[in-house]
């Protein structure tokens, strides 16, 4: 579960390392975001000469959470940390060209097939 002020790792090569959630999108007073939800983030830590810089405000999609994802068969997939992939603010296209670490099958919809195809492992 991701809420405002949550720090997340960035799972792509856009140049950001750590981001902070500043808003959960979708609904007027939505409190939590789960895997596959879009959030608004600000970049807290970035590498030099990256595509993004510290202080930028972007959209991101949550790809891994410590809370995990519950499947219809009752199984739960949990991860060691919270991670997201940065998106362009207007077109919501992926900024990076590589995805690091596994992602879940819950991202498999029309919007995020690019993330599924770039990911090294889909759980």
From Swiss-Prot:
Keyword RNA-binding present in the record's keywords: the answer is yes
Name the PROSITE patterns on file. Answer: RIBOSOMAL_L14 (PS00049)
Q: Which GO terms describe its biological process?
A: translation
| UniProt cross-references to Pfam families, sorted A to Z | Ribosomal_L14
Keyword Disulfide bond present in the record's keywords: the answer is no
Q: Give the transmembrane region(s).
A: none
- GO cellular component annotations of the record: cytosolic large ribosomal subunit
The UniProt keywords, alphabetically, are: Ribonucleoprotein, Ribosomal protein, RNA-binding, rRNA-binding
Q: Which GO molecular-function terms appear in the entry?
A: large ribosomal subunit rRNA binding; structural constituent of ribosome
Assembly notes:
Part of the 50S ribosomal subunit. Forms a cluster with proteins L3 and L19. In the 70S ribosome, L14 and L19 interact and together make contacts with the 16S rRNA in bridges B5 and B8.
Q: What does this protein do?
A: Binds to 23S rRNA. Forms part of two intersubunit bridges in the 70S ribosome.
Concerning its family, UniProt says: Belongs to the universal ribosomal protein uL14 family.
Name of the molecule in the record = Large ribosomal subunit protein uL14
Q: Which organism is it from?
A: Photorhabdus laumondii subsp. laumondii (strain DSM 15139 / CIP 105565 / TT01)
Give the lineage. Bacteria, Pseudomonadati, Pseudomonadota, Gammaproteobacteria, Enterobacterales
């Amino acid at each position: 579960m991701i809420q405002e002020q949550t720090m997340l790792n960035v799972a792509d090569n856009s140049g950001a390392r750590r981001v902070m959630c500043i808003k959960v999108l979708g609904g007027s007073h939505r409190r939590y975001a789960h895997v596959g939800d879009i959030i608004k983030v600000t970049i807290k830590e970035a590498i030099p000469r990256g595509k993004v810089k510290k202080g930028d405000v972007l959209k991101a999609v949550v790809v891994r959470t410590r809370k995990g994802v519950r499947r219809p068969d009752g199984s739960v997939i949990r991860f060691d940390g919270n991670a997201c992939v940065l998106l362009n603010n207007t077109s919501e296209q992926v900024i990076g060209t590589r995805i690091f670490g596994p992602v879940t099958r819950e991202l498999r919809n029309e919007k995020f097939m690019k993330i599924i195809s770039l990911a090294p492992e889909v759980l």
